[in-house]
């Protein structure tokens, strides 16, 4: 994610008028914390024993486990988007690009609920907002933004698969399969490489 920060600064310094889209995975696995999120819920000893790093994102939101997933970052000038000045509208405008990509492989995504957020959860994927992407009501992609000097950085995590027991150990809260889903659950035949190919076009 340091690269994303550097790319954001590069865009600002060079006054880029186009987008930067990046896909990546993590090795070793890593917990990323939202920009202003407290970290007192983390068991650092457990994470160290299991070779799981911890970083803090530039973007907001809540914590994610980057393990069996694909992370994306999208950088653009605020004025590049039709409604770039409006936070929720800009989330949706960027996310509609992902909706279109996933539709080509038979995965129809929609935006999450606009219900009040349950603020007790530390794990991002357990909270579905109107800017998140869901499959049949279950969250598949969680995203977060930051803004700096007229530019937007949006991060997102696309769940390929997940370890329910590990998530519950890290975040100390029940992970309901009624709340989240994964690419592997939707279509086990889809590989990470296929997803990356589709998103890269």
Predicted regions located by residue number:
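Residues forming anionic-ligand binding surfaces in small-molecule and nucleic-acid pockets
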Residues: 62-81, 171-183
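Short, solvent-exposed loop/turn segments at the edges of secondary structure
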Residues: 67-69, 128, 153
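Short, conserved charged micro-motifs
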Residues: 41-42, 81-87, 166-168, 190-194
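Long, positively charged amphipathic alpha-helical accessory segments at protein N-termini or as interdomain linkers
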Residues: 94-117, 149-201
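Helix-start/capping segments and mature chain N-termini
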Residues: 67, 78-81, 87-97, 166
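Non-catalytic, conserved peripheral segments adjacent to functional cores
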Residues: 142-146
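Beta-rich nucleic-acid/ligand-interaction surfaces
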Residues: 111-135, 139
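Active-site loop/lid in soluble adenylation, ligation, and acyl-transfer enzymes
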Residues: 1-45, 49, 53-57, 124, ...
